[in-house]
């Protein structure tokens, strides 16, 4: 196949799978609506909590007499007190005494601090008092830098008799509002940056310190009349819900996106559990296009969910969404969503059961929610601890958390929250992605990645997880095995028919369309070679065109492994099969073009119609458009499903689903058809239809049929192969096998109780020469004896059986019957035949 043909085939497969995913999503509208509406529901719940404000319960605090020292929280600086106006002589004199009483320095704005809005010279301040020119300047700084200043005092009025060293100063605040009062306002910081950090009300110590400074001033200046002191207290900025945003915001955004993670695990695991993926691969589907279709589908759903999440957040006017650049929001949510989906694809290379998928998905959801709550509650502090430079423990935690997309997602949320908590004054812009977050506090140095780096880490996880998924899937499908045909020495077979079939298949001049030569398969146990399973051992045979081969064997005999190798699901350990000139080892793609499968498990999606299934597989098999409708109509009529062609498979009975699977296997006029128990679950009438169909289509084909119904095998198969423990133990038609392995006559006896079974076995085997006990099924016992047994002995035996069963006091048997040996008897005997020497 040329490169152009390969690309075209891959594109067709991708288009088909995307169409299938779209139709299944539309028809499964209930689950699709739940998945897509999850962000709206979670954000609305959060909005209700947000609207009720912070749930922080402020506790009682004891204060010392002096002004308390500030503690560094969100920035590498903190300021005890800011005051204004600095051009008021009276104000400055009072604040000098306050600074002296509390051993603090006064810094003037802007000469000592640097200009607004950043006041760069204050970086590294741990305490002190800053003199501002006006209350307006002070408020600008507070809005830009919340949680940095404990309080602000703004003086409004001094009494007319206010003097400094006996001299009345030239101050516009003297007698400005009242002739006799000294008035000032105190602005308090009651906002907080973390859910576990409760704000402290410093109104009492701040006011007490100011009053003490005023009293000291009057005492120093020998003024006996102390004025009436009036003050108002106001919170800096009323972040009524800042704790709710910090504590729960990220949790709800996380949950809104992780719902799609659980849905993805379930949907893909469902297709694997129902063998839908494997069935399509056996019909020629490209494995890489299967996974690519799911990547495109899941990433598209992730994008829709992220856009809905951002839209509902903006509609609810949540500061997080209004104060953050749209591109930053989209990058954060979308990268988290697709990195989580990529991690899901990595897990799905090992997960094949829906219960396991849901369990793992819920475990990640719950554990991740706990981590998210912890990260958001501690804010930037937790990342400073994790990214500290001198801790081996922190380095170990970083390595573990790095592989989790939720860790980087939480980091970005925290960075954004630190900026937008004072929205609208402060917003998160594109330029903030590169802000330096390194620093040192609490005795530790830390190198925290920028917000942009955290986004890049999530993108790296997308690449890593998808690459690992592709590599593991390729390895599990045998992609890394060297495509060469290995041969082993021909073993010795006791059965002459098996030996002849083996020698015939190995003959280089054999021109049969279907030749199997020394096919073997060993499933090795990693690190436990002694536990390796030899599933197939040197299977060799040839099949002529127009033949139905019955492949028989008990469970674990090697039937499924044989079909898996011939359809490319497994790679053989040694040997090869040549199918119409194409090697299954070297050219499986060409083999699949002429091969079709009716698997034991129906390859059906309940959401699709019979017609949609047939169109899907017709295009998958490469049937030309001009022939497609005719082929579909033909197979629908053959399995009598024409009237329900446009009904969804969810409305079909088990028999109808099975007939549709047979129709799918027959479409496209394949040269080879593998039928794995095609009539399972069918009523007798439907079985006859399938029998007729098989007889009609076998003319120019090779059909390999497996079944546990020996009557069905006798009707359909011209040649039978029985496997036992991976070995071909007999090869021939039904008459040959019954002649060779049959017991002649078969006697069935139904015992009255389990206790009398040993007595019945002894009675029958002693009454008939060379009689053998074959099997027991509950109370039914089967015996076989040679066809050349003396008729007199047989007649006498039957008379004794008849007299026993007619005796009302008989406690041995209820009934008995006799028949010629059938394929069931042959199968039982052959299954116990000595194995390969």
UniProtKB/Swiss-Prot annotation:
Claim: ATP-binding is one of the keywords in the record: yes
Record keyword Transmembrane helix present: yes
PROSITE patterns: ABC_TRANSPORTER_2
UniProt-recorded name of the protein: ABC transporter A family member 8
Domain ABC transporter: 516-750
A Gene Ontology term for the protein's cellular component: membrane
Pfam families linked: ABC2_membrane_3, ABC_tran
Main location: membrane
Membrane topology: Multi-pass membrane protein
Any GO BP annotation: lipid transport
Residues spanning the membrane: 29-49, 244-264, 303-323, 326-346, 356-376, 393-413, 455-475
UniProt organism field: Dictyostelium discoideum (Social amoeba)
Taxonomic superkingdom: Eukaryota
Family statement drawn from the similarity comment of this UniProt entry: Belongs to the ABC transporter superfamily. ABCA family.
Binding site for ATP: 553-560
Gene assigned in the entry: abcA8
Entry's localization field: Membrane
A GO MF label: ABC-type transporter activity
Keywords (A to Z) from UniProt: ATP-binding, Membrane, Nucleotide-binding, Transmembrane, Transmembrane helix, Transport
């Amino acid at each position: 196949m040329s490169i152009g043909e390969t690309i075209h085939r891959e594109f067709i497969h991708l288009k088909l799978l995307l169409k299938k995913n779209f139709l299944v999503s539309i028809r499964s509208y209930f689950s699709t609506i739940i998945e897509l509406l999850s962000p709206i529901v979670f954000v609305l719940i959060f909005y209700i909590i947000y609207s009720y404000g912070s749930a922080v319960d402020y506790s009682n605090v004891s204060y010392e007499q002096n002004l308390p020292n500030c503690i560094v929280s969100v920035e590498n600086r903190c300021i005890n007190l800011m005051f204004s106006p600095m051009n008021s002589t009276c104000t400055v004199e009072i604040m000098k005494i306050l600074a002296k009483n509390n051993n603090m320095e006064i810094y003037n704005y802007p000469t000592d601090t640097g200009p607004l809005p950043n006041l760069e010279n204050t970086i590294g301040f741990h305490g002190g008092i800053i003199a501002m020119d006006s209350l307006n300047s002070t408020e600008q700084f507070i809005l830009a830098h919340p949680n940095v200043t404990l309080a602000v005092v703004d003086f409004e009025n001094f009494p007319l008799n206010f003097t400094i060293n006996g001299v009345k100063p030239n101050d516009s605040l003297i007698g400005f509002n009242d002739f006799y009062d000294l008035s000032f306002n105190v602005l308090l910081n009651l906002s907080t940056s973390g859910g576990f950090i409760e704000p402290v009300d410093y109104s009492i110590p701040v006011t007490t310190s100011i009053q003490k400074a005023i009293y000291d001033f009057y005492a120093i200046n020998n003024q006996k009349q102390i004025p009436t002191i009036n003050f108002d207290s106001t919170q800096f900025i009323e972040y009524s819900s800042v704790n709710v945003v910090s504590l729960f915001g990220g949790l709800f955004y996380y949950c809104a996106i992780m719902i799609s993670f659980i849905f993805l695990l379930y949907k893909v695991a469902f297709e694997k559990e129902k063998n839908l993926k494997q069935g399509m691969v056996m019909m020629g589907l490209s494995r890489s296009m299967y996974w690519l279709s799911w990547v495109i589908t899941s990433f598209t759903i992730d994008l829709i969910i992220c856009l809905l999440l951002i839209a509902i957040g903006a509609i609810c006017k949540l500061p997080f969404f209004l104060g953050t650049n749209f591109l930053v929001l989209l990058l954060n949510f979308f990268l988290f969503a697709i990195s989580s989906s990529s991690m899901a694809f990595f897990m799905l290379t090992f997960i094949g059961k829906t219960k396991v998928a849901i369990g793992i998905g819920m475990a990640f959801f719950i554990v991740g929610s706990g981590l998210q709550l912890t990260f958001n509650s501690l804010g930037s502090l937790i990342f400073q601890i994790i990214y500290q430079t001198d801790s081996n423990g922190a380095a170990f935690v970083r390595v573990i958390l790095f592989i989790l997309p939720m860790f980087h997602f939480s980091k970005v949320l925290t960075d954004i929250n630190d900026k937008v908590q004072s929205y609208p004054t402060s917003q998160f812009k594109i330029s903030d992605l590169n802000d330096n977050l390194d620093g040192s506090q609490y005795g530790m140095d830390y190198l925290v990645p920028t917000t942009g780096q955290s986004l890049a880490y999530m993108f790296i996880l997308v690449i890593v997880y998808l690459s690992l998924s592709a590599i593991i899937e390729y390895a599990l499908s045998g992609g890394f095995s060297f495509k060469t045909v290995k041969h082993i020495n021909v073993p010795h077979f006791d059965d002459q028919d098996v030996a002849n079939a083996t020698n015939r298949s190995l003959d280089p001049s054999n021109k049969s369309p279907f030749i199997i030569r020394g096919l073997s398969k060993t499933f090795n146990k990693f690190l436990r070679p002694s536990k390796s399973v030899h599933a197939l051992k040197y299977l060799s045979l040839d099949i002529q065109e127009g033949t139905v081969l019955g492949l028989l064997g008990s469970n674990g005999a090697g039937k499924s492994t044989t079909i898996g190798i011939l359809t490319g699901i497994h790679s053989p350990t040694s040997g090869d099969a040549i199918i119409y000139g194409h090697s299954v080892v070297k050219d499986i793609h060409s083999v699949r073009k002429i091969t079709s499968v009716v698997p034991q498990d129906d390859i059906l999606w309940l959401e699709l119609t019979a017609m949609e299934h047939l169109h899907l597989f017709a295009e998958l098999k490469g049937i030309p458009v001009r022939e497609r409708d005719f082929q579909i109509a033909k197979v629908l009529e053959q399995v009598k499903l024409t009237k329900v062609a446009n009904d969804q498979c969810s409305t079909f009975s088990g028999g109808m689903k099975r007939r549709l699977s047979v129709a799918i296997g027959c479409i496209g006029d394949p040269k080879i058809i593998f039928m794995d128990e095609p009539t399972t679950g069918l009523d007798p009438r439907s079985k006859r239809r399938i029998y007729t169909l098989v007889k009609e289509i076998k003319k120019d084909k090779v059909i390999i049929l497996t079944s546990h119904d020996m009557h069905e095998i006798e009707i359909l198969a011209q040649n039978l192969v029985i496997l036992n423990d991976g070995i071909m133990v007999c090869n021939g038609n039904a008459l040959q096998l019954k002649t060779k392995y049959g017991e002649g006559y078969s006697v069935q006896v139904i015992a009255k109780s389990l206790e009398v079974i040993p007595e019945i076995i002894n009675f029958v085997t002693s009454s008939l020469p060379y009689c053998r006990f074959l099997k027991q099924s509950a109370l039914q016992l089967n015996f076989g004896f040679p066809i050349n047994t003396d008729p007199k002995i047989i007649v006498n035996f039957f008379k004794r059986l008849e007299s026993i069963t007619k005796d009302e006091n008989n406690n041995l048997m209820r009934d008995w019957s006799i028949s010629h040996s059938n394929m069931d008897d042959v199968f039982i005997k052959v299954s116990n035949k000595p194995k390969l020497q």
